[in-house]
């Protein structure tokens, strides 16, 4: 389907970009065990009506990373790239459930970590306690996803 075409395009561009980045890092003598990579996941663009399934995103992202990122890199911290909070968490969880990878897979989300908390806060001091609870919940869900232990049944 169309979503798969866009994901393939994302895969190809991501792979080419990552290979170029690591070639340049090697040329500059960068110590790879001392870096973290902050890439996108292989997803269809946010404008695409057909997003495809969670496992396809996880499989294509891991395949892209496996083909592009040296094993010496200790960790990969993903951008959410316009995904919803739950989608970003589900995709990270699916990748970590696939088994061992040469790098730790974690998150460096902005919107996908903060969006619900900011909406709850709405600039009102009286909302701070509930805002903290919402933010803590989202962080906890992503923490579980880092070890492949997230479940949508834990969502509030």
Q: Each predicted region: which residue ranges?
A:
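Active-site capping/gating regions of soluble enzymes
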Residues: 7-156
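Short, small-residue-biased leader/transition segments that mark boundaries at the very start
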Residues: 2-6
């Amino acid at each position: 389907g169309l979503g798969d075409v866009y994901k393939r395009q994302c895969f190809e561009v991501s792979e080419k970009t990552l290979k170029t980045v690591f070639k340049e890092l090697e040329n500059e003598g960068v110590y790879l065990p001392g870096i973290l990579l902050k890439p996108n996941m292989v997803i269809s663009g946010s404008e695409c009506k057909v997003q495809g399934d969670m496992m396809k995103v996880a499989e294509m992202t891991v395949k892209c990373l496996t083909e592009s990122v040296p094993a010496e890199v200790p960790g990969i911290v993903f951008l959410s790239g316009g995904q919803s909070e739950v989608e970003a968490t589900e995709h990270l969880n699916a990748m970590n459930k696939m088994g061992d990878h040469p790098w730790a897979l974690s998150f460096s989300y902005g919107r996908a970590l903060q969006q619900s908390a900011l909406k709850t806060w709405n600039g009102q001091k009286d909302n701070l306690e509930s805002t903290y609870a919402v933010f803590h919940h989202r962080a906890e869900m992503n923490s579980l996803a880092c070890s492949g232990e997230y479940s949508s049944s834990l969502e509030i």
